[in-house]
Amino acid sequence: MAMEPSPNGSQVQNPGSLPDGLIAVVKADCPACALARPVFVDLAERADLTVYTQDDPTFPTEADWVVDDTDLAISWGLDLDAVPTLLRIEGGVETARTTGWDRDRWEEFTGVSNLGPDLPPFKPG
């Protein structure tokens, strides 16, 4: 579950107008997403995170920064294979992504330490 460049190894323009920073694409009906819910809340407070949810616009319930993607337009445009997927967007371009919950990888990816200290260190997406 390595960090990867955008699909096909190239930088692709974002579908629509995605914000720069970190983007998490999640769904409530995903065990890894449900497990990582407190991490999304934490990242929203400590980093520039936007969450796109595929199935429940109220997931995570603590958030007012969730974007409804129940029509999957963003997810399809980003060519996602699994959730949770964490993406880095710079200058309107996806520069990296990682899939599934992996504490060490997410800390490296986000530059934020001590993510989900009470969670198992790994759960595939």
Where would I find each of the regions flagged by the language model?
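Hydrophobic beta-strand anchors of alpha/beta hydrolase catalytic cores
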Residues: 22-23, 86
